[in-house]
């Protein structure tokens, strides 16, 4: 079992430069404490996430830590050009000596997608094409691709990752019917939610994995479970701290939905 941190970098009420510095100091603490990895969210136009460009913040994390693995959870591929993602991934992996964990996803907020002119209902094909191009660019020295959204002919890729063929891939998983793709492609998954549906997902993952891979259980990709946790001297103190932090985070979480008259 490994322990990591997932951070939205949501607005905290302090000056933004101090907000970033506070988080970087926390990353240094996670590094010294022996945490496995530090993951950050990507959000746009909302106080839920101040690391709108994950690569910029993670470049600082790479320089402030020595052993801690880190990465986006996730890069929103439907909002970014795949060649830029390829190049930033390679740079981060090189700058950290091969410590990048690569989270990828389509994006979950229709309002944030709309800021970029992307229709959330039609974003799946865009995401799939972008993912295919990113994986090609991380594995090969030249990109040739013909799709609906992207067309590339003999595009050279001069950068490369330390980790071969790619850094570890992470994918957020909320439904068991999405498991086969992740298990077949040996992608690490992370889940939220109650224990029962999460168990359904992880059981299904192990089942599909065993059908397609024969390397043994020690090669099974990681399956993460997200939980809000506060450690304090007493339950009462922990609850008090947790409520203060959770109330602020949840207000930020609802921000765009409330602004569009769709409160959660």
Question: What do the predicted segments below correspond to?
Answer:
Residues 175-195:
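A conserved active-site cap/scaffold subdomain adjacent to cofactor or substrate pockets
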Residues 7-21, 75-83, 121, 163-173, ...:
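Active-site mouth loops of central-metabolism enzymes
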Residues 31-32, 58-67, 89-100, 183-184, ...:
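Acidic (Asp/Glu)-rich catalytic clusters
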Residues 123-157, 196-264:
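An alpha-helical appendage that flanks or caps ligand/catalytic pockets
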Residues 3-7, 38-40, 69-73, 100-104, ...:
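Hydrophobic faces of well-ordered beta-strands that scaffold small-molecule active sites
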Residues 3, 30, 34, 42, ...:
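Conserved, mostly hydrophobic/aromatic
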Residues 2-16, 78-145, 149, 189-197:
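Flexible, glycine-rich active-site loops centered on histidine and acidic residues
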Residues 1-70, 164-167:
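N-terminal beta1-alpha1-beta2 module of alpha/beta enzyme domains
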């Amino acid at each position: 079992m490994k322990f990591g941190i997932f951070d939205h970098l949501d607005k905290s009420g302090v000056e933004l430069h101090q907000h970033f510095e506070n988080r970087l100091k926390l990353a240094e603490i996670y590094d010294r404490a022996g945490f496995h990895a530090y993951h950050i969210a990507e959000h746009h136009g909302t106080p839920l996430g101040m690391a709108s460009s994950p690569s910029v913040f993670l470049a600082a994390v790479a320089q402030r830590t020595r052993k801690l693995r880190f990465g986006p959870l996730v890069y929103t591929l439907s909002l970014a050009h795949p060649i830029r993602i390829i190049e930033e991934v390679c740079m981060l992996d090189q700058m950290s000596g091969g410590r990048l964990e690569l989270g990828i996803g389509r994006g979950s907020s229709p309002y944030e997608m709309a800021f970029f002119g992307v229709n959330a209902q039609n974003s799946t094909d865009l995401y799939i094409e972008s993912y295919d191009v990113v994986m090609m660019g991380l594995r090969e020295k030249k990109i040739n691709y013909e799709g609906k959204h992207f067309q590339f002919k003999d595009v050279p890729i001069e950068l490369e990752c330390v980790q071969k063929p790619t850094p570890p891939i992470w994918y957020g998983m909320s439904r068991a019917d999405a498991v086969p793709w992740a298990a077949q492609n040996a992608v690490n998954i992370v889940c939220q939610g109650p224990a029962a549906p999460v168990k359904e997902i992880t059981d299904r993952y192990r089942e599909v994995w065993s059908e397609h891979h024969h390397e043994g259980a020690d090669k099974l990709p990681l399956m993460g479970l997200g939980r809000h946790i506060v450690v304090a001297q007493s339950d009462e103190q922990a609850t008090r701290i947790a409520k203060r932090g959770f109330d602020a985070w949840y207000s930020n979480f609802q921000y765009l939905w409330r602004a569009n008259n769709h409160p959660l």
